[in-house]
Design a protein with these regions (language model features):
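Histidine-rich, glycine-flanked metal-binding segment
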Residues: 24-39, 45, 49-89, 109
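Acidic, glycine-enriched loop/beta-strand segments at the rims
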Residues: 27-31, 45-58, 71-72, 375-380, ...
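Metal-associated gating/positioning segment near the N- to mid-region
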Residues: 86-154, 158, 176, 242, ...
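Active-site gating loops and adjacent loop-to-helix segments of metal-dependent hydrolytic enzymes
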Residues: 101-118, 176-193, 227-241, 296-331
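Histidine/acidic-residue-rich catalytic or RNA/ligand-binding cores of hydrolases
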Residues: 104-107, 149, 229-231, 268-274, ...
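His/Asp/Glu-enriched, well-ordered alpha-helical/loop segment
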Residues: 112, 253, 257, 322, ...
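Divalent metal-dependent hydrolysis catalytic cores, especially in the metallo-beta-lactamase
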Residues: 123-148, 162-172, 216-229, 257, ...
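Histidine/acidic residue-rich metal-binding segments in metalloenzymes
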Residues: 151, 202-223, 227-300, 329-347
Length: 438
């Protein structure tokens, strides 16, 4: 075993240990919780863990946490909230969003908007996400030279504004000429890319430290080219094995996991072997990629809907002509590969890749996972329990069980028979507090 292999193995061995000491705010500090006793009556409950739903259920909540789940009976304690005509389920978790990105020409918009403006716009987006049922959101880098979404997170933590629990990465790391660089700018212009452009082992280590210093509790690396940015090929691996190993090693030592954007099979495999916890997209994954995902317990966040959105609803977008061409060409292949991963038992989860489409439509990601081979129940669990496990927050969110934070939503009808019901969220509770839309 050579020195590089030994280092990689040690990094992988450390990953589980580091996870228990995950840096960043605890989930229950990310939004204020209610005080007192509340009973929530649900006509039907999908709890995020059980294989079937239950009828006429009472959820007892004390000081923001669930203390009991059982059959409803008259005389329930505390304030009673009646959702007996609705289906209740755990608050949804979006494992992949870019809340500061609002336009299809985001690489140009990155240059025209200030970080302060992006913070205000991002606050609006995350509030819309909360009202639409997303009670936890992992932000995987944003087109901002500063850390505007962490300012949004702090404002929510301090109770200045309502919003979901936020976690994630400040920026996405890109090689020079990669998916986070501005590859349409003449060389004499020195302009900051929408990503964090960084090259070399020492530079990536320093970048990891700076990201964590400024609030990142995930590190995001573009391990391949991208579908949406100009001048790079998503089917090419980016960052050398040494750079990837250094990124994961540095992040792991500091208790922070790594999310790897990887479309190409080579980028996927290199990221898994380096020790990434999640693979984002996975468009060109092959059988060996799927085997490694399963063997290493790495989560796959395929982000299927964003391509459909641009192809079907913005087919004439000049800014996303590349995305539309690639989606048209490779959509079926991507869906089939995700189906293979599901069948192989890979932890496939839900990430909307939000980049400015109507927030309510993000739940259509679940329908595409059903198209790939999941049942509706599996898709709902992917957006709740499995995503909580991805975050390492399974003791706090993701299921409706005693001991968990009372992050609960309700929808009319039965989403197990019609997933579009998830676009009609009628009730949101965050930490036992009912969230009211202004």
């Amino acid at each position: 075993m050579n020195k590089r292999t030994t280092s990689s193995c040690l990094a992988l061995a450390c990953l589980t240990l580091a996870w228990t000491a995950h840096a960043g705010p605890a989930p229950d500090t990310l939004a204020p919780s209610a005080t007192g006793i509340t009973t929530l009556r649900c006509g039907t409950l999908i709890d995020g863990r059980s294989a079937t739903s239950r009828r006429d259920v009472a959820i007892r909540i004390e000081d923001g946490r669930i203390v009991a789940v059982g059959a409803f009976a008259p005389g329930a304690a505390g304030t009673v909230i009646d959702r007996s005509q609705d289906t209740c389920l755990p608050g949804l978790i979006d494992a992949h969003a870019h809340v500061l990105i609002k336009t299809d020409d985001y690489q140009v918009d990155h240059l025209r908007r200030s970080s302060g403006y992006k913070a205000l716009r991002g606050l609006n987006v995350v509030q819309e996400m909360l009202w639409s049922g997303w009670t936890t959101v992992r932000i995987l880098g944003d087109a901002d030279v500063a850390y505007a979404h962490f300012d949004v997170r702090t404002a929510i933590q301090e109770g200045l504004f309502s919003g979901p629990r936020l976690t994630g990465a400040g920026h996405y790391f890109s090689i020079t000429g990669g998916g986070g660089d501005l590859n349409f700018i003449a060389p004499e212009h020195q302009v900051a890319g929408d990503g964090l452009v960084v090259d070399g082992v020492d530079a990536v280590r320093k970048a990891v430290r700076e990201e964590i210093k400024h609030g990142s509790d995930w590190i995001k690396v573009l391990a391949s080219g991208a579908m949406m940015s100009a001048g790079n090929d998503p089917n090419r691996a980016h960052f050398s094995p040494d750079e990837l190993a250094a990124i994961v090693d540095e992040a792991t030592r500091l208790g922070v996991p790594v999310a790897a954007h990887a479309h190409s099979a080579a980028g996927i495999k290199a990221s898994i072997l380096a020790g990434a916890r999640t693979i984002e997209h996975g468009t060109f994954m092959d059988d060996e990629s799927i085997r490694l995902l399963k063997e290493k317990g790495v989560y796959l966040v395929p982000t299927l809907y964003v391509g459909d959105y641009y192809l079907n609803e913005q087919p004439g977008s000049e800014a996303q002509a590349k995305m539309n061409e690639l989606t048209r060409k490779y959509r079926a292949q991507h869906i089939a590969a995700v189906g293979k991963a599901i069948k192989a038992g890979v932890n496939v989860t839900v990430g909307t890749d939000y980049v400015g489409f109507p927030v309510k439509q993000g739940v259509r990601e679940l329908g595409l996972l059903v198209e790939a081979g999941m049942t509706p129940m599996q898709a709902i669990q992917a957006a709740t329990r499995v995503n909580a496990e991805l975050l390492g927050w399974q003791d706090h969110v993701g299921t409706v069980e005693a001991g968990k934070l009372a992050d609960i939503i309700a929808v009319p009808g039965d989403p197990l028979h019609d997933l579009s019901m998830l676009e009609k969220v009628s009730f949101v509770m965050l930490g036992g507090r009912e969230v009211l839309r202004p």
